[in-house]
Amino acid sequence: MRINPTTSGSEVSAVEKKNLGRIVKIIGPVLDVAFPPGKMPNIYNALVVQGRGNEQTNVTCEVQQLLGNNRVRAVAMSDTDGLMRGMEVIDTGAPISVPVGGSTLGRIFNVLGQPVDNLGPVDTNTTSPIHRSAPAFIQLDTKLSIFETGIKVVDLLAPYRRGGKIGLFGGAGVGKTVLIMELINNIAKAHGGVSVFGGVGERTREGNDLYLEMKESGVINEENIPESKVALVYGQMNEPPGARMRVGLTALTMAEYFRDVNEQDVLLFIDNIFRFVQAGSEVSALLGRMPSAVGYQPTLSTEMGSLQERITSTKEGSITSIQAVYVPADDLTDPAPATTFAHLDATTVLSRGLAAKGIYPAVDPLDSTSTMLQPRIVGEEHYETAQRVKQTLQRYKELQDIIAILGLDELSEEDRLTVARARKIERFLSQPFFVAEVFTGSPGKYVGLAETIRGFQLILSGELDGLPEQAFYLVGNIDEATAKAMNLKT
C-alpha cells in the first residue's frame, strides 16, 4: 500500500510554492495553464488555483493533457466561478490525495477528501493518492468463495462472490436504500468489516436522506462517530463533471486502505455507476476528444476497467462492490450499461410487483443471477435447492394467468400443490431487517446459509404443506415459521 504523507491536494499551506503556472484560458470547468520551461506537471497531478490578494479561491484541478508550448489542460473539481486569466496556479507535485483509515468512518467527504458534514477536520495524517494501479496478479486471491450476507434470497438464489462486483437494478421506492443499509449492517456484525458509500452524480436530496436514515438506524453512530460502520463520499449531480468522474476513485481509495492495511473485508457501494460513465463522457467532450458510439468517450472501456480492476480480493482482504446501475431508456445494449455488465459477477434485481405485495426485500428471485451458482462452487445441495426453488416459482408464474381467469379450482392437483408451495416460498424469501426495526417493530434476523438451505428443502419436500402461508411471512429461519404457525392456530 503506497501512502502519500502530503495533505489533500486542495490545502495549499502544505504545498511548497516551487512550481508556479498561470491560467491562460478558461472554458467552463476546463483550464489551460502555462508553466515555465522544464517545469511541466505530470498527468493526474493536482493543481491549485490561488486567489488574487486576500481572496481564498483554492480551486483544485487535475492535469488531463499536456498540450505543448509549456501548457497543460486541467479539469476543475469545483466551480470555476470567479477565476480569471493570469491567476497563479500551484503544481502540488502529486495526484489528489484523500484521508484514509478508521477516522473516515461516520463522516461525509467530497471528491478531494474534505469533510462536508460540519463536524470539524478529520483526525488523521494518513492520506493516499486516488490514482493507483490494480493489485498485481501475485497479490490476488483467486479462490472462489461465497460472501454470506445473511439475507436469504441473496444467499440462496444469487449469491455474492467475495471480492466480486454486483449490479443492483431497481426503480425508485422499491427498497434499494434499505437493502444497502442492511448489507452495511450485516458485514460489520458478521464479518467485522466496514463499508464505503460513493454517491456518484446522484441527487443531493437522496444523499442527505441516506445519511439521515443511516443515523436513525444506527449504521452511523451519532454519539460515538468512530464506532460507525460506513464512510460516505459524495460527488452529486450539481457538481462539475471532473468531481463526478473522480469521486468513485476517492471512495475506492478509502476502501483499499481498509483492505490492504487493516486487512478487512470491505463493502464498496457505488450509486450510480452510469453517472461515472456520463461524467467521463462530458470531460472527454470538453477535452476535445472525438466521441465514439452513441456519443460516449472513446476511452470508455479503459476508464471502466481502471476503476473495476482495483475492486478485487487480495491475500490481505477483499473489496466486494455493489453498484447501482441506471439503464438509459431501458436499453441494455447501450454502451454504458453493456460495458458495466462485462465486469459483474452477480445481479440483484428489485421488483416493484413484489414490493407492492409487501414482500421485502423485494428481490426478484427469477431475474436475479449469479455466476457463483454452480455445483462446483456452492456444492450440489445448495445448487439443487436453488434450482428447485426457481422451477417452482417459474411454474407459479406460468399458472398465474389461468388462476386469474378460471381460479385455483380449475388447476390439476399437482399444480395446486405447486402453487401452495410457491406462495410459501415467496413469503419465506421475505425477511425482517435490522435497519428496518425502527419502522416495523419486528427484530431483524440474520440467517446463515445452511439454515436458509434447510428451510427451503423442508418447504419443497412437502413436510410443511399443512402450515398456513402467512406463517412464512417476515420470519428468519424455518423454525420461526413453524413456531409462528403454532401461534396462529392457538
Curated annotation (Swiss-Prot):
Its EC number is 7.1.2.2. Gene3D superfamilies: 2.40.10.170, Bovine Mitochondrial F1-atpase, Atp Synthase Beta Chain, Chain D, domain 3, P-loop containing nucleotide triphosphate hydrolases. This is ATP synthase subunit beta, chloroplastic. GO terms for cellular component: chloroplast thylakoid membrane; mitochondrion; proton-transporting ATP synthase complex. It is an enzyme of class 7 (translocase). F-type ATPases have 2 components, CF(1) - the catalytic core - and CF(0) - the membrane proton channel. CF(1) has five subunits: alpha(3), beta(3), gamma(1), delta(1), epsilon(1). CF(0) has four main subunits: a(1), b(1), b'(1) and c(9-12). It is found in: Plastid, Chloroplast thylakoid membrane. CDD domains: ATP-synt_F1_beta_C, ATP-synt_F1_beta_N, F1-ATPase_beta_CD. It comes from Ipomoea setosa. ATP binds at G170, G171, A172, G173, V174, G175, K176, T177. Pfam families: ATP-synt_ab, ATP-synt_ab_N, ATP-synt_VA_C. It catalyses: ATP + H2O + 4 H(+)(in) = ADP + phosphate + 5 H(+)(out). SMART domains: AAA (SM00382). Belongs to the ATPase alpha/beta chains family. The keyword Membrane applies. InterPro entries: AAA+_ATPase, ATP-synt_VA_C, ATP_synth_F1_bsu, ATPase_a/bsu_AS, ATPase_alpha/beta_chains, ATPase_F1/V1/A1_a/bsu_N, ATPase_F1/V1/A1_a/bsu_N_sf, ATPase_F1/V1/A1_a/bsu_nucl-bd. One of its GO terms (molecular function) is ATP hydrolysis activity. It is a peripheral membrane protein. Produces ATP from ADP in the presence of a proton gradient across the membrane. The catalytic sites are hosted primarily by the beta subunits. Keywords: ATP synthesis, ATP-binding, CF(1), Chloroplast, Hydrogen ion transport, Ion transport, Membrane, Nucleotide-binding, Plastid, Thylakoid, Translocase, Transport. One of its GO terms (biological process) is proton motive force-driven mitochondrial ATP synthesis.
